[in-house]
């Protein structure tokens, strides 16, 4: 189970605050036990300030890299498919898919209304561009089965062909990395990653590496629009400091574990309440 801590709202704004918190939690897709908190004080701007103890280094947030910023990956980059509320696989960039009887071929039918945050269209050509980059950067070995090739069937259909059955592919595509999608404008003239360009609900507005990242809604997002104007992620390593920030109203949400002895303090604070939700964990064995 994972735990959440949130402030009780004042002045009749409880429902509005709950919606803000629920949206941020959904975006974060936290995959481990954690405590969260939400500030009661209403702000003129619709801003949520969240804290994490992991390194915030968006300059390294290349979707094919295994950086620590998995929450940024979830907010900026979309997968072909994603986990639903009950652990079932749901459409994302792919609106539907077909699996061959032998489990070696997956055909994905892409949405036709998707654009990246810079306005670039997402389509089969973009999937092929990303696939070629996976090959060049030697990340296709992350699939549980050997990927033989990817083929463009038409402008919005792609086919993944494996050497043997890959029954876990949909689960693997739901992971934050390394198989999410960016576009050519994310790379500099030397082919090196230089900026975060994705199809997700959020895009980076500004950041101070190792300190904070400010995200704003992606104006080209194809799905439901967020009902907040800005998310500020702050890197706060010390657990006690995160608790104090929640109590003072400096921060709204804690996305990391806090000291166990602080749980009673949170429970005793009338401006804080706790929530529980089922978390998803993936276990795997690898051979040397």
Sequence positions of predicted segments:
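Short, low-complexity disordered leader/linker segments with a strong preference
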Residues: 1-47, 61, 88, 149
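N-terminal lobe/hinge region of extracytoplasmic solute-binding protein
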Residues: 51-101, 132, 197
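Gly/Pro-rich hinge or "lid" segments in bacterial periplasmic/extracellular proteins
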Residues: 84, 88, 174-226, 230
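Aromatic- and charge-enriched surface segment that lines or borders ligand/interaction sites
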Residues: 95-137, 159
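Surface-exposed binding/hinge segments that line
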Residues: 98, 102, 142-185
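Ligand-binding "clamshell"
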Residues: 144, 263-276
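A bilobed periplasmic-binding-protein/Venus flytrap-type ligand-binding module shared by bacterial periplasmic
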Residues: 216-221, 279-288
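Ligand-site clamp/hinge motif
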Residues: 219-264
């Amino acid at each position: 189970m994972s735990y959440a801590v949130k402030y009780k709202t004042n002045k009749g704004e409880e429902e509005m605050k709950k919606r803000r918190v629920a949206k941020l939690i959904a975006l974060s897709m936290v995959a481990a036990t954690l405590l969260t908190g939400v500030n009661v004080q209403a702000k003129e701007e619709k801003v949520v300030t969240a804290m994490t103890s992991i390194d915030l280094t968006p300059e390294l947030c290349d979707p094919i890299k295994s950086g620590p910023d998995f929450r940024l990956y979830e907010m900026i980059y979309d997968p072909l498919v994603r986990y639903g509320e009950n652990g079932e696989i749901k459409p994302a960039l792919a609106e539907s898919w077909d699996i061959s009887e032998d489990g070696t071929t997956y055909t994905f039918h892409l949405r036709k209304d998707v654009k990246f945050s810079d306005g670039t269209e997402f389509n089969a050509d973009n999937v092929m561009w990303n696939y070629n980059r996976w090959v060049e950067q030697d990340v296709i070995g992350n699939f549980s089965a050997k990927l033989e090739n990817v083929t463009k069937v038409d402008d919005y259909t792609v086919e993944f062909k494996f050497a043997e059955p890959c029954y876990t592919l949909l689960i693997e595509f739901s992971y934050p990395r390394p198989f999410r999608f960016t576009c050519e404008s994310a790379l500099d003239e030397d082919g090196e990653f230089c900026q975060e360009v994705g199809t997700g609900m959020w895009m980076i507005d500004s950041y101070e590496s190792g300190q904070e990242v400010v995200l704003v809604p992606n104006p080209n997002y194809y799905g439901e629009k967020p009902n907040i104007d800005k998310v500020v992620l702050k890197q706060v390593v010390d657990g006690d400091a995160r608790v104090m920030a929640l109590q003072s109203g400096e921060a709204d949400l804690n996305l990391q574990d806090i000291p166990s002895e602080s749980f009673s303090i949170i429970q005793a604070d009338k401006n804080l309440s706790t929530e529980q939700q089922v978390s998803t964990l993936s276990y795997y064995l690898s051979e040397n």
